[in-house]
Amino acid sequence: MNPNYLDFEQPIADLEAKIQELRKASTGPAVNVETEVRALRDKLRVRTAQIFRDLSAWQVSQLARHPQRPYTLDYIDTICDEFQELAGDRAYADDKAIVGGLGRIDGRPVVIIGHQKGRDTKTKVARNFGMPRPEGYRKALRLMKLAERFRLPLLTFIDTPGAYPGIGAEERGQSEAIARNLLEMAELKIPVICTVIGEGGSGGALAIGVGDRTLMLEYGTYSVISPEGCASILWKDAAKAKDAAEQLGLTAKRLKGLGLVDKVIREPTGGAHRNPEQMGKRLKAVLLNELDALEKIPVDALLQQRYERLRSYGAYEGH
């Protein structure tokens, strides 16, 4: 199977392969297969729509982890007129699992922070598979305070399986670094927009996920634990990850219904990786619209709304 297709996309892969075969067969001057190709493309569109109309939580999880899915730097390239990356936490090291810096979107200055994964073995190792260490979160905090100092809106892009659980990370205060970011983000005197672009894994995601708006791409996930981890704990069997994904309620649709996500951004048919340019333009339009709304709110009112928003999480009514 083509590695760019997931298992549930096999019918799509088969139709794409047939189209390619016909294209190759049409190289001769006397061969015209356009009618057959058009028919197959129509069938492909219908079949793709059918498959993506009712995805399971596990299938959404697979899409969120797709190796070709756009990452933070890909979106920065698409939405920013210019961007200057800043490095280091000024205390220990520069964690490549988190990127951030100063940018302009349609001339508007912003600070952007996001998780960053790698594409190949070398960059995956360099980025630690998108799992930040304490110095990554402290770098993020440094940039947050920089944004506050210069009164620049903050945009964060969330895409991590979780914070790195290694011994060194724990020794350097992983839990403190995450907790500190939660505290500081709750009190930043600037507009903060957080967007889940892929995986939103537990505290590792939440450490750059406290803000005035939480956006989520259609096939992103946001959860306290991975489906595999949940299955291992509850049923002692990682093979039950599909069941765990359903129970966790980690999809954008479920989280929007619970009020944990403000807006779900529709992805191109087949996922963001099928048309990264289109996805970037959609994301840019939504971010600019949200910034326009937030920048009209006085700082005191913004902080009060953020406080009330955070206090509302977990509230329920008895029956």
UniProtKB/Swiss-Prot annotation:
**Superkingdom, natural source:** Bacteria
Q: In which pathway does it act?
A: Lipid metabolism; malonyl-CoA biosynthesis; malonyl-CoA from acetyl-CoA: step 1/1
Reactions that this protein is recorded to catalyse: N(6)-carboxybiotinyl-L-lysyl-[protein] + acetyl-CoA = N(6)-biotinyl-L-lysyl-[protein] + malonyl-CoA
State one Pfam family annotation: ACCA
> Any idea where this protein resides?
Cytoplasm
Q: Which GO terms describe its cellular component?
A: acetyl-CoA carboxylase complex
Give every CoA carboxyltransferase C-terminal domain span. 32-293
Name the keywords, alphabetized.
ATP-binding, Cytoplasm, Fatty acid biosynthesis, Fatty acid metabolism, Lipid biosynthesis, Lipid metabolism, Nucleotide-binding, Transferase
* Protein purpose: Component of the acetyl coenzyme A carboxylase (ACC) complex. First, biotin carboxylase catalyzes the carboxylation of biotin on its carrier protein (BCCP) and then the CO(2) group is transferred by the carboxyltransferase to acetyl-CoA to form malonyl-CoA.
Could you tell me what this protein is called? Acetyl-coenzyme A carboxylase carboxyl transferase subunit alpha
